[in-house]
Amino acid sequence: MQFDTDWVRSQFPAFNEPTLQGQAFFENAGGSYTCAPVIERLTRYYHSRKVQPYGAYPASQAAGAEMDEARTGLARHLGVDTDEVSFGPSTTANTYVLAQAFRQFMKVGEAIVVTEQDHEANSGPWRRLAEDGIEIREWKIDPTTGHLDPADLDKLLDERVRLVCFPHCSNVVGEINPVTEITAAAHAAGAFVCVDGVSYAPHGLPDVGAIGPDIYLFSAYKTYGPHQGIMVIRRALGEALPNQAHWFNADTLYKRFTPAGPDHAQVAACAGMVDYLDALAAHHGKDAKEASALMRDQEVHLLQPLLDALSNRNRVRLLGPSDAASRAPTVSVVLDRPGFEVAQKLSEHGIMAGGGHFYAIRALKAMGVDPDHGVLRLSFTHYTSQTEIDQLLAALDAVL
């Protein structure tokens, strides 16, 4: 069955919003549109279940059940146990909680590997542990391509490395990193692995159980959901790290790294993300676990013409691979004008795009790009239409 873009777009109310008509959305990496099931669940929760969950009366029990439904459904798609899925206010906040746990867990002189390719969320919290005597080793990127070479990691690994942190996919380079290969190398050296999946998850939730990292982080609001950070913490590591929650919650894995009460309504609404992914697969006659492949195939089909058009332009530097199959549809280009300025010009042609450094300051500097100049970032996902791609290409012709 051919990918049904019309059906997909019907699941996102933003496409029927009068104030957005005629505008093509190419800033999905900053936050995707929200699917209807999430909005419906959030609305229902505030209408009929906005009470303390897990209590003795029906509304309270329904509230707790819906929160559990979110965790159970996400765990099914992520290939992990239900209690290995935790929620928090954002990925950055979740990483700071994890960094605090590792600060207590590690000894002075032990090491953490971080990359130049990461968004600051999976970099800054770990680097701050240097203040406590933890050695920070930097896995550098290729200054021309932004590529993160696994062979370079081998040179950084030894018995003192306890944790390796890297992105599944950079939010400016766009290249998809070989998580399974990198994780296996880190594990062989005795290190745990933390993967930032924020820029990858919107293009298909990974089978975390299969690819193997000990921690996998992503953001619901960039994955068609509400503003929540979602983290998978595998059982062996989650039980070994010091509890960061109330002492009486220490025996419940999914509570150990949620220091404060979660946003009940938004956690419950995350079940709508699962509703959508299941419906997407069913509509196309696929198993629910095949939803990710459906999304990915459609994105690759739309992405290659954009990459070709940008690669063939003078005075345009494309960051990351020019092959759609090896990257996410998060496309950053360096121009002779500041990225934000070009994004403003594109808006006059009905294109919603982003310009700036996108909290990837270290990556841009490593590639010789002034963060204040920034990049133009064009990012989309599976619900983007061919018509919108054509609109973008025409706008780029006019502006560049």
Task: Please give the residue ranges for each predicted region.
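Pyridoxal 5′-phosphate
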Residues: 1-400
